[in-house]
């Protein structure tokens, strides 16, 4: 691999790490191993609470970032019905639980998703 000429690499961004933090860590590791500062950028951010593929471009491939950002993305989520947390995400422990016996797969699939461009699973 020639990181100076340019490479496109995909990493699995860890939970609680920012996209910039992940990029900085990879830059540090590559620069230390190669003996020179590696030019590196990412083709889109992920929330620190999200995990998933983060596309990194090095060297001359950083010029392709804008084009890579036009590609379709797919998101998946796991949720727990009948539970809340202080922050409404998994950053805090469950603080209240509610009955869920009335929630059926059909009800979930027929309930409109409130976020733009998202759809219920099939």
Walk through the language-model features, giving the residues of each.
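Catalytic/RNA-binding core of pseudouridine synthases
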Residues: 1-122
